[in-house]
């Protein structure tokens, strides 16, 4: 069973996409009475229209997630116009700690995937408060960041984004750093296809993509995160050993300990199987460090009970 914690925009977009991909045992949990039940019923009716067999239910009780093999955490407040991910920290950290206790009590064997922002810090809280192995506490971010970079590259070059391999590291926020040197199109290094100015434009568009969506429509991205969550579920369920970037707890990788950072990793049926350490230049190491320090700063502002 796949449990989605939170029946808001991201949670419901995820549920719809999972249904359309054939995942037929879904549970929505949210605190608002009637909200997850109504959403589940609406989605069940849609499935009937489409001829899709699905078992989906809604609940206000966290006990109902017993037996879940994957828990997708989408609960929390979304980013409002003008609000940074960092400003979400205090508002969502307590929610993560509370959900961690619920997951630990009722779904102790589940793989937990977090999309609540600021996701790097929220993943740190979830890891610390569940006490789960780090392989089973995964912050979703990098798939979306890299996909955004691939989209902007494809738009500038007039090619399919399926041919683009884009890499973003560090964190999900303003200190994320796209890595043009390690990105390519059809196997050709990006630096051979685009000018320095064009690459700088792609980097800027990628970093500011989330804020642009929020500014344009008044609330943060939901379809993008949902699509990435679905890819993550598929990689776990199919044991496909895909390499995706995630926000993960580091234990010596890239020279860091006791912090979460966005790095590429192999994912399969047990969660994260290994973190891939890319060869970085001195300038790239500096940018990676800036991202890590930004996450550390966020974590250090949390009360001790949320980070220990």
UniProtKB/Swiss-Prot annotation:
<feature type="binding site">
    <location>
        <position position="85"/>
    </location>
    <ligand>
        <name>substrate</name>
    </ligand>
</feature>
<dbReference type="GO" id="GO:0004459">
    <property type="term" value="F:L-lactate dehydrogenase activity"/>
</dbReference>
<feature type="binding site">
    <location>
        <position position="148"/>
    </location>
    <ligand>
        <name>substrate</name>
    </ligand>
</feature>
<dbReference type="InterPro" id="IPR022383">
    <property type="entry name" value="Lactate/malate_DH_C"/>
</dbReference>
<keyword id="KW-0521">NADP</keyword>
<feature type="binding site">
    <location>
        <position position="117"/>
    </location>
    <ligand>
        <name>substrate</name>
    </ligand>
</feature>
<protein>
    <recommendedName>
        <fullName>Malate dehydrogenase</fullName>
        <ecNumber>1.1.1.299</ecNumber>
    </recommendedName>
</protein>
<dbReference type="GO" id="GO:0006089">
    <property type="term" value="P:lactate metabolic process"/>
</dbReference>
<keyword id="KW-0560">Oxidoreductase</keyword>
<comment type="function">
    <text>Catalyzes the reversible oxidation of malate to oxaloacetate. Can also oxidize tartrate. Can utilize both NAD and NADP. Catalytic efficiency for malate oxidation is 3-fold higher with NADP.</text>
</comment>
<feature type="binding site">
    <location>
        <position position="92"/>
    </location>
    <ligand>
        <name>NADP(+)</name>
    </ligand>
</feature>
<keyword id="KW-0520">NAD</keyword>
<dbReference type="InterPro" id="IPR001236">
    <property type="entry name" value="Lactate/malate_DH_N"/>
</dbReference>
<dbReference type="InterPro" id="IPR011275">
    <property type="entry name" value="Malate_DH_type3"/>
</dbReference>
<feature type="active site" description="Proton acceptor">
    <location>
        <position position="172"/>
    </location>
</feature>
<feature type="binding site">
    <location>
        <position position="79"/>
    </location>
    <ligand>
        <name>substrate</name>
    </ligand>
</feature>
<keyword id="KW-0816">Tricarboxylic acid cycle</keyword>
<comment type="subunit">
    <text>Homotetramer.</text>
</comment>
<feature type="binding site">
    <location>
        <begin position="6"/>
        <end position="11"/>
    </location>
    <ligand>
        <name>NADP(+)</name>
    </ligand>
</feature>
<dbReference type="GO" id="GO:0046554">
    <property type="term" value="F:L-malate dehydrogenase (NADP+) activity"/>
</dbReference>
<dbReference type="InterPro" id="IPR036291">
    <property type="entry name" value="NAD(P)-bd_dom_sf"/>
</dbReference>
<dbReference type="Pfam" id="PF00056">
    <property type="entry name" value="Ldh_1_N"/>
</dbReference>
<dbReference type="GO" id="GO:0030060">
    <property type="term" value="F:L-malate dehydrogenase (NAD+) activity"/>
</dbReference>
<comment type="similarity">
    <text>Belongs to the LDH/MDH superfamily.</text>
</comment>
<dbReference type="Pfam" id="PF02866">
    <property type="entry name" value="Ldh_1_C"/>
</dbReference>
<dbReference type="InterPro" id="IPR001557">
    <property type="entry name" value="L-lactate/malate_DH"/>
</dbReference>
<dbReference type="InterPro" id="IPR015955">
    <property type="entry name" value="Lactate_DH/Glyco_Ohase_4_C"/>
</dbReference>
<feature type="binding site">
    <location>
        <begin position="115"/>
        <end position="117"/>
    </location>
    <ligand>
        <name>NADP(+)</name>
    </ligand>
</feature>
<dbReference type="GO" id="GO:0006099">
    <property type="term" value="P:tricarboxylic acid cycle"/>
</dbReference>
């Amino acid at each position: 069973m796949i449990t989605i914690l939170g029946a808001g925009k991201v949670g419901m977009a995820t549920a719809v996409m999972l249904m359309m991909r054939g995942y037929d045992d879904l549970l929505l949990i949210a605190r608002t009475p009637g909200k997850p039940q109504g959403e589940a019923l609406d989605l069940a009716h849609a499935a009937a229209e489409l001829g899709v067999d699905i078992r989906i239910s809604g609940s206000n009780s966290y006990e109902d997630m017993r037996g879940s093999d994957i828990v997708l955490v989408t609960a929390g407040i979304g980013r409002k116009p003008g609000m940074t991910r960092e400003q979400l920290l205090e508002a969502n950290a307590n929610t993560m700690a509370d959900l961690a206790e619920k997951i630990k009590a009722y779904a102790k064997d589940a793989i937990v995937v977090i999309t609540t922002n600021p996701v790097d810090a929220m993943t740190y809280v979830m890891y610390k408060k569940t006490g789960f192995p780090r392989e089973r506490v995964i912050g979703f971010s990098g798939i979306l960041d890299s996909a955004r970079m691939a989209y902007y590259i494809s738009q500038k070059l007039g090619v399919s984004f399926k041919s683009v391999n884009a890499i973003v590291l560090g964190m999900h926020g303003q200190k994320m750093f796209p890595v043009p040197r390690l990105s390519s199109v059809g196997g050709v290094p990006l630096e051979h296809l685009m000018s320095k100015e064009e690459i700088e434009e792609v980097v800027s568009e990628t970093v500011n993509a989330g804020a642009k969506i929020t500014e344009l429509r008044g609330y943060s991205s939901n379809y993008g995160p949902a699509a990435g969550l679905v890819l993550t579920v598929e990689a776990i369920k199919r044991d496909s050993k895909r390499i995706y970037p995630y926000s993960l707890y580091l234990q010596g990788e890239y020279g860091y300990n006791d912090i979460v950072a966005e790095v590429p990793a192999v994912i399969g049926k047990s969660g994260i199987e290994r973190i891939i350490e890319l060869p970085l230049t001195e300038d790239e190491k500096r940018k990676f460090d800036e991202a890590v320090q930004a996450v550390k700063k966020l974590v250090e502002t949390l009360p001790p009970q949320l980070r220990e």
